[in-house]
Amino acid sequence: MSKNSNVEENGGAKPICEALRRFKRSRLVFEPSLGVLGFFLVGVCLVCSFFFFDYRSVAKSYGLSDKSERFVWLKFDNISSSSSSSSNSSKRVGFLEESGSGCDVFDGDWVWDESYPLYQSKDCRFLDEGFRCSDFGRSDLFYTQWRWQPRHCNLPRFDAKLMLEKLRDKRLVFVGDSIGRNQWESLLCLLSSAVKNESLIYEINGSPITKHKGFLVFKFEEYNCTVEYYRSPFLVPQSRPPIGSPGKVKTSLKLDTMDWTSSKWRDADVLVLNTGHWWNEGKTTRTGCYFQEGEEVKLKMNVDDAYKRALNTVVKWIHTELDSNKTQVFFRTFAPVHFRGGDWKTGGTCHMETLPEIGTSLASSETWEQLKILRDVLSHNSNRSETVKVKLLNITAMAAQRKDGHPSLYYLGPHGPAPLHRQDCSHWCLPGVPDTWNELFYALFMKQEAPSSSKRVEEANSTGNVTMS
């Protein structure tokens, strides 16, 4: 009897043991997958909580740098169209406020802003085909949605109508190389957005904007103002060398003379100058272009010395030829190029760049040396109280981070894209980086206008007539 009962007990136990063995085998099969899945879920929870609970505090607690505004590529922070960005912004003063006077607007970061760009290329008829990247093949538009955020203050939003009112009956003149033209066309687009009837904006000589060399003058008839561009890559004239010069001297730069078109800029109310891209051996001595002072060609003078002497000539002209009571002068610094694996002649590229290099500089040592020369020249002449003050648009460091902003393959218009070995990594797509230069220009211009407006109000108060502008 006991034997049968043992058999029965064993027989009943077998299915249970077999089930346990099968469960163990299946558990061994699924254990790695469950482990990976669990690890993944824990990781997701940690990442989400990191951003949910304010990653600035987490970063600080671990001794990490608080660079929240540099994590913009994640789009978790500093989106001005969202209320989440208001905390840091509200702590900063407005640049145009009296308390914002000490703010360095060129010290800051690029932040993602979905309210940008300020215009669309298809809506602006004042753009060269070479700058209309999105119209002619460039499919990514990330480069249009970055805003410059100064570290210690907030820039004013560009107000095209207000700017045009300030320019009423005035001349705004850009002088420089094709990068200066890039900025000039950007400003035309920004300003034209406030004019409903675009037939009231026209080139006074009927010249087309695309592939036109020399100078162009666009009039905003409703405001009786002009926004002009004069091509002068060196700001000093390039001409035939003196008779008897060595055969290798094909042309010369007259370092002690202003460009011949300078008589056309002299009466400008606002003057924006730039030079830099042509001050290198490739554009000068290697092509037979040497430097001249008086009637003597300086065969041994290097490019940096020549650049410095030319800048001194420009500054002297500003101080002696311009009316300090009328003309505001701005000087924009060099905007770095971003060729990889060569330059524009040797197969350099930038077509794979779609994001900025946040927080780091991609500028060469030559670029920083050029900036130092410019700053030294302007600083040396800044203490002369009787002269025109030159305001520096110091965009070099901020532009150095924007390797993503160039036309690359998309500068040939409807005939593009260009061959891979012939890319443009010098100029800038529009809308794009030059719009930011103009936002900074606008901020400095409006800051300069504010004291004169206050002075007019005070004068009106003293006579009993108050007018607001």
From Swiss-Prot:
Compartments, as annotated in UniProt: Membrane
Motif DCXHWCLPGXXDXWN motif: where in chain: 424-438
Paired cysteines (S-S): none
Keywords: Membrane, Signal-anchor, Transmembrane, Transmembrane helix
GO cellular component: membrane
Keyword set includes Transmembrane helix: yes
Topological category with respect to the lipid bilayer: Single-pass type II membrane protein
GO biological process: circadian rhythm
Residue span of motif GDS motif: 176-178
An MF annotation (GO) of this entry: O-acetyltransferase activity
InterPro entries noted in UniProt: TBL, TBL_C, TBL_N
Coiled coil location: none
TM annotation in the entry: 33-53
Protein family: Belongs to the PC-esterase family. TBL subfamily.
Role, per record: May act as a bridging protein that binds pectin and other cell wall polysaccharides. Probably involved in maintaining esterification of pectins. May be involved in the specific O-acetylation of cell wall polymers.
Note: Contains 2 motifs that are conserved in esterases, but it is unlikely that this protein belongs to the catalytically active pectin esterases.
UniProt name for this protein: Protein trichome birefringence-like 10
Organism (species): Arabidopsis thaliana (Mouse-ear cress)
Organism phylogeny: Eukaryota, Viridiplantae, Streptophyta, Embryophyta, Tracheophyta
Gene name as annotated: TBL10
